[in-house]
């Protein structure tokens, strides 16, 4: 029985009125992938550490990118709600509080984080949007729970350790 650690790292001094619903959303959506299995997840806020299976950095917006401190030349779609960048054996993921369209609803972070996790946990693939079952893997992330194919890919991704940008 594996317990996969998902660390949420706040880079914007978020209030508990923001962090609690984000954590609840991430826990619920990721937890759906492990229903009926002997594995589970543990979601917590704090600094990332090498033992974490997935580290998600929360920043104000693209201009406040944490990933660009490590990879200054990476490109991000200007309308993205999050971004994952991998180089060599290292993957980093960040989620944005605001986009040009406005603030992202807190309840949507579970689906957004799940989508970005598929990029993070499969750093050598570039076909996540088309080959991982649609749904939350799609380029335009629906306001929905993960489908069975999404869940299967997430479990597969967690089964192999990907080095995380801390």
Where are these regions (language model features)?
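N-terminal leader/targeting segments
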Residues: 6, 32-36, 137
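Metzincin-family zinc-dependent endopeptidase catalytic domain
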Residues: 16-128
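Short beta-strand segments enriched in small/hydrophobic residues
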Residues: 1-14
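Generic structural signal for residues positioned in beta-strands
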Residues: 5, 55, 92-94, 130-136, ...
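Alpha-helix initiation/capping motif
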Residues: 15, 96-97, 142, 161
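The catalytic-center signature of Zn2+-dependent metalloproteases
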Residues: 102-166
């Amino acid at each position: 029985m594996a317990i996969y650690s998902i660390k949420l790292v706040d880079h914007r001094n978020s209030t508990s009125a923001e962090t609690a619903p984000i954590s609840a959303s991430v826990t619920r959506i990721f937890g759906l992938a492990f229903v009926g299995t002997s594995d589970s997840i543990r979601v917590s806020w704090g600094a990332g550490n090498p033992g974490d299976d997935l580290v998600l950095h929360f920043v104000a917006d693209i201009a406040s990118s944490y990933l660009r401190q490590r990879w200054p030349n990476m490109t991000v779609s200007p309308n993205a709600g999050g971004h994952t960048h991998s180089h060599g054996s290292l993957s980093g993921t960040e989620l944005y509080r605001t986009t040009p369209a406005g603030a992202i609803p807190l309840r949507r972070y579970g689906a957004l984080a799940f989508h970005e996790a598929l990029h993070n946990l499969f750093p050598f693939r570039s076909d996540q949007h088309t080959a991982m079952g649609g749904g939350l893997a799609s380029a335009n992330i629906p306001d929905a729970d993960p489908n069975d194919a999404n869940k299967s890919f997430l479990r597969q991704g967690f089964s192999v350790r990907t080095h995380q940008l801390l």
